[in-house]
Every structure is written in C-alpha cells, then in structure tokens.
Design a protein with these regions (language model features):
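N-terminal beta-alpha supersecondary unit
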Residues: 2-86, 115, 119
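Adenine-nucleotide phosphate-binding core of ATP-dependent small-molecule kinases
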Residues: 207-214, 219-263
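Glycine-rich beta-strand-to-loop/alpha-helix junction loops that act as flexible
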Residues: 82-85, 102, 140, 263-271
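Glycine-rich phosphate-binding loops at beta-strand->alpha-helix junctions
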Residues: 91, 259-278
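A short helix-loop
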Residues: 3-9, 16-21, 30-31, 130-132, ...
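Conserved phosphate-binding catalytic cores of ATP/NTP-utilizing and phosphoryl-transfer enzymes
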Residues: 112-134, 304-305
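Conserved phosphate-binding/catalytic loops in two-lobed NTP-binding clefts
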Residues: 112-113, 262, 279-302
Length: 331
C-alpha cells in the first residue's frame, strides 16, 4: 500500500510517500519539506496570508518531485493523508483542497489527520517496537500538551499550557533580544556561549500539573529592559529554565499517572540541550524522541498516521473542511 502524506498546517510545505509492506519492510520512499523561513523572518513571525499563498505555489511541484524520486506514478497511490487540524486555517485549507482534488480525480480515499497525532506517531517511524499505550508530550510553537494514548490511539489530555506554548516563548524571547526568527535554533546556538546559572528565573505555576510560560517571558522582558545581563546569559538561563520546567511538570504528573513510556515530539524537541537535559534527568522514564527532521513539521508523520488510521475508514468527503482549533476531536 502506498500512502501520500500532505502537510501544510503552518509555514512548511511537505509531501511524503510511505510504503506499507507486510514483510516488515515498510518505509518512507521519499519526503521533501519546503521551508518558508526566508519569507517570514523579516516580519518576526509567520504571516498567515504569505504562508497560504506559498503552499499553493509549492504543492504541485513537491508532489511531482516526490513521485519522481520514489519512481512511482500518481496512479500508484492507494491512500491520501492530509493535515486538516489544528493550525493556520488558510494554510490548512490549501493542503486539504489539494488532497481532496487528488482523491476525487484518482478515486482514492482521503484521511484527515490531526497534526498532533502526526507528531506523536512520528516516534513510531523510528522506534519499531513502540506501540501504545504510552504518554505523549508535544512541545512546539503552537502547543505544549501532555496526552495519554491508549492502545486504540485514543488521546486523553493530561496537562497543557494555560498561556504561551514553549516554542512561542522561544520566538518571543529571541525577538525581545533582537535576534530574529525562528527563535528556537537562534536561542539554542547563543545559549552555548552563556552561563545557564547566571540568572534565576521563575517556573510558572510550579505546583500545577499544567504549563505556563508567559510569566517567564515577562520576567525576561524586564531583565532586558534593565540592560544589566549579557544576551548569551539570558538565552542560556531561559533555555535552562524551559528544560527544568518540562522536567518538573513531567515529574509532577508522574505522581498521578504511570508515565513509564513517554514520546517527546514537536519542533522544540529538536533542541539538543532540552533533549539531553530530559534524557539525563528522567532516568526512570523510557523516552522516545524522534530525530530533528521528524520533530519539525513534515509529511512523513502524516503519511504514517494515515496508515495507522486506515482501519477506521473515516474518510473525508468533498464537503469536509479544515479546522484551526485543537478542540476538534482527534479523529
């Protein structure tokens, strides 16, 4: 079975083909991601209209590229999986419209995939013996959410951010330091030159199982205004506090839930410092963290998620749309 994955939830356009085989040789045949960082960096963040228009420009050429590299024809595709929630609504529309048009023309089924489900299942692409039940922590520019995933891939929300997502906090701190966008890799690189213990920063809602990063962000703004600390020390202290916050929240939730298997995914999971901090600190938790290319937005995870959900046969019809909110059910 050949599954086409399409991802356009934010500012990356991605296409992938996943081949499912019964002989344990299932694999991604080819995947491509077209980043829009150069289009948005001067604005200090993603401009939804620009993102949507660029998806429209890129989708067809990326599809042809993936088919060519996979040595497959469009008629070989058996199933189409497309991100349809949550995300930037205009960006989502472009991918969903493209997928539905392909499905209609080829007479092939289309599955709408929750972006957060894709992030979680990206770990299964790497760890062959990883199966639910497990817990999933998604840390990205739009989400900081902890879920329990049962053996039927039903998600139960355990904890979440009550304000800023962690990736959003990275972007805003970078912007306050006049370092540019996206903030994640910029802060990580600058922090290597700083002292992570130079500044004692607060952990938001430290006694709550939920996450909060707005207070941390505000505290850093006040420090920057005082102009008494070096940027690299601010970056290092912020990154340390972000990692410490994740660790403490996981341990706090572990008191109530049996968090013995934990997937950590999403764009912030590509941060090597945070990855090392949690891997070192959470010694009694089995961690599964995908490589960086699968932490950021990609179509590989969407194609694989479509494979996992195929048995539900909950296919999209032409009247179905995209949804920008997480409150929509996972399936």
């Amino acid at each position: 079975m050949l599954i086409l994955g399409i991802e356009t939830s934010c500012d990356e356009t991605s296409i992938a083909i996943y081949e499912h085989a019964d002989n344990n040789k299932s694999k991604i045949l080819h995947s491509v991601v077209s980043s829009q960082i150069n289009l948005h960096s001067s604005f200090g963040g993603v401009v939804p209209e620009i993102a949507s228009r660029n998806h429209i420009i890129k989708l067809e050429s990326l599809l042809l590229q993936v088919l060519n590299k996979s040595e497959k024809s469009i008629n070989d595709i058996d199933l189409i999986g497309v991100t349809n929630r949550p995300g930037l609504i205009g960006a989502l529309f472009t991918g969903v419209a493209f997928a539905k048009a392909l499905g209609y023309a080829l007479k092939k089924p289309v599955l709408g995939i929750n972006h957060l489900l894709g992030h979680t299942l990206s770990a299964e692409l790497i760890y062959e013996n990883l199966f639910p039940p497990y817990y999933s922590l998604i840390i990205s520019g739009g989400h900081t959410h902890l879920f329990f995933v049962d053996n039927c891939y039903n998600f139960t929300l355990i904890a979440k951010t009550v304000d800023d997502a962690l990736g959003e906090a990275f972007d805003k701190v970078s912007k306050m330091l006049n370092l540019g966008y996206p903030g994640g890799p910029i802060i990580e690189k600058l922090a290597q030159q700083g002292n992570e213990k130079a500044i004692l920063l607060p952990i938001g809602m430290k006694n709550s199982p939920n996450f909060s990063f707005s207070g941390l962000k505000t505290h850093i703004k006040l420090l920057i205004d005082k102009n008494i600390y070096k940027a690299e020390d601010i970056a290092a202290s912020f990154q340390f506090t972000a990692a410490l916050t994740l660790y403490k929240k996981i341990m706090l939730n572990k008191k109530k839930y049996n968090i013995n298997k934990l997937i950590i995914s999403g764009g912030v999971a590509a941060n090597n410092y945070i990855k090392h901090y949690l891997t070192t600190g959470l010694k009694d938790v089995q961690l599964f963290i995908p490589p960086a290319r699968l932490c950021t937005d990609n179509a590989e995870m969407i194609a694989y998620a479509a494979h996992r959900l195929f048995g539900r046969r909950d296919f999209m019809d032409l009247s179905e749309s995209a949804y920008d909110k997480l409150s929509v059910n996972f399936y």
